[in-house]
């Protein structure tokens, strides 16, 4: 097949990477497969614009962060490069490799990170040499706190490119919650807790974590209720502004989703924190009460995880600021949640 960029120069990707045989491909084209986000003509996003706008201004903005986004494919290229266009989110307590970086996996094995530059905030290029030409199952995880307008994958022009092997569990696990759910403050996107679950159970997932903005609005609950999912996990304790708000919304969100999904496994979690003050303990009891009420009403597919149990591995050493997990904290969350899912046969 002839390279279309030879005919339409607007499709040619300009690059500063010096690599013989380098050719870029738009991930919107076959055989690449994008998960967790979709392109709306301007950028990749996590929810439809009209739905997000109906929830809140903060959600309308936050859906442009590409947390949970992935592109997957198979190739025997001896290198993989990216050419990324977008707006890069950078924060003092958050590694750039996490907030605005992409990382690379072969199957379940981390291979390397496409490290963003210090000075530029409008995208970048990066290349990882692999050293062999074996066929590989590739996953590239999107940044957790950045906007992605376009992403091109650079491969050897003579390499084979194939569609990825489908996930064993194709219906996604849907995660809803706070900045922790979104991925703050992992050192790279693949070390958030949700990708651990995807790798462990070979399942798709959708990240609906919204920094400071997860308030369990009815519009959000209705949107989630309409998704075709294999499992729903929710934890917005940190973002609920008061005990009164949490009381008014937590069970209500559960009931909205349960009404449309009578057989869906639903896991509710309290905030992942090792030590709780008296107010935080009251919040935990509100969340647990939703679970207890559902069980008392005969619900046989509802589950509860005490957020302190999410810290079993890391103890009190799992955050950057006594709130947002480090990679160690996320690994601890993933281990507890993954073991719970496995023990209860939820995937």
Task: Label the predicted regions.
Residues 1-172, 342-347:
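N-terminal secretory targeting modules
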Residues 2, 64, 218-347:
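Alpha-helical cap/lid subdomain in secreted, periplasmic
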Residues 86-88, 179, 211, 238, ...:
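Residue-level signal for short, function-critical loop segments
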Residues 170-191:
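Catalytic nucleophile-elbow at a beta strand-turn-alpha helix junction centered on a G-D-S/GDSL motif
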Residues 187-196, 282-290:
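Short, solvent-exposed amphipathic alpha-helices that sit
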Residues 194-207:
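Short helix-loop-beta junction
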Residues 207-214:
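Short beta->alpha junction loops
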